[in-house]
């Protein structure tokens, strides 16, 4: 009861062909193929864009920035 035999699948295929017809199914498959092609093209375009970007410059955190020493002794709160 849980598994479908070959006869069940044949009946399903015949019903689908009768409902949709040969032309609609081929049009649907063509639309699916175009969608897949445009998706792959978009992925390739993204890869090309990523390759063209310049690498990010790294910042050396080992050396502290050169700045004047801070003195809070002479400051007054207003």
Curated annotation (Swiss-Prot):
It is a single-pass membrane protein. InterPro entries: TatA/B/E (IPR003369), TatA/E (IPR006312). Residues 43-78 are annotated as: Disordered. Its main location: membrane. Gene3D superfamilies: 1.20.5.3310. It comes from the Bacteria. GO terms for biological process: protein transport by the Tat complex. Residues 43-60 have a biased composition (Basic and acidic residues). It holds the Pfam family TatA_B_E. GO terms for cellular component: TAT protein transport complex. The chain crosses the membrane at residues 1-21. Keywords: Cell inner membrane, Cell membrane, Membrane, Protein transport, Translocation, Transmembrane, Transmembrane helix, Transport. Part of the twin-arginine translocation (Tat) system that transports large folded proteins containing a characteristic twin-arginine motif in their signal peptide across membranes. TatA could form the protein-conducting channel of the Tat system. The Tat system comprises two distinct complexes: a TatABC complex, containing multiple copies of TatA, TatB and TatC subunits, and a separate TatA complex, containing only TatA subunits. Substrates initially bind to the TatABC complex, which probably triggers association of the separate TatA complex to form the active translocon. This is Sec-independent protein translocase protein TatA.
């Amino acid at each position: 009861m849980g598994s479908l035999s070959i006869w069940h699948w044949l009946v399903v295929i015949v019903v689908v062909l009768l409902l949709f017809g040969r032309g609609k199914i081929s049009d649907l498959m063509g639309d699916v193929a175009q969608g897949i092609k445009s998706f792959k093209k978009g992925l390739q375009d993204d890869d090309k864009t990523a390759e063209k970007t310049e690498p990010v410059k790294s910042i050396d955190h080992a050396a502290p920035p050169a700045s004047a020493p801070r003195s809070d002794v002479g400051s007054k709160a207003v």
